[in-house]
């Protein structure tokens, strides 16, 4: 069974690094992927996209037994609009948005664990919850 569900941005600049990062942590072949512009941001505003994402998670939960959702956001994401170019500010804002998305997902899927990571242009992965800002 596949225990993990990855939500990541469709931005080509971060695809390879994200999959490599997952492989290095033993997730190779152990995750379903939803790659969508803005990653989990659509859970916060657009009803149609929110429904799409939640339906994908529900499908994976029912058919693949997922227990964990791993969210990746990245630096300089066009879906975030015009925000600060300062990496630390972006990390803080993205972690806030991912936490909001987590609350939406946990409301629908209370038994699913959620992990959140921000990826910098230097391909450094910053887990949410670490006091780095």
Identify the residue ranges that each predicted region occupies:
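Divalent-metal-activated hydrolytic enzyme cores
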Residues: 1-4, 9-18, 37-51, 61-67, ...
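Short Gly/aromatic-enriched secondary-structure transition segments
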Residues: 19-25
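Short glycine/proline-enriched loop/turn "hinge" motifs that connect secondary-structure elements
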Residues: 25-28, 63-64
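Short, contiguous, well-structured surface segments enriched in hydrophobic/aromatic residues
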Residues: 31-34
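Acidic beta-strand-to-loop metal/phosphate-binding motif
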Residues: 68-74
């Amino acid at each position: 069974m596949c225990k993990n569900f990855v939500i990541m941005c469709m931005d080509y600049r971060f695809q390879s690094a994200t999959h490599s990062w997952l492989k290095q942590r033993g997730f190779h072949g152990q995750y379903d992927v939803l790659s969508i512009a803005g990653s989990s941001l659509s859970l916060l505003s657009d009803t149609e996209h929110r429904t799409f994402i939640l339906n994908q998670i529900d499908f994976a939960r029912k058919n693949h037994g997922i227990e964990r959702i791993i969210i990746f956001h990245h630096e300089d994401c066009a879906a975030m609009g015009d925000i600060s170019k300062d990496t630390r500010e972006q990390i803080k804002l993205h972690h806030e948005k991912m936490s909001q998305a987590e609350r939406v997902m946990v409301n629908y899927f209370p038994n699913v664990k959620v992990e959140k990571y921000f990826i910098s242009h230097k391909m450094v992965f910053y887990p949410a919850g670490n006091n780095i800002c």
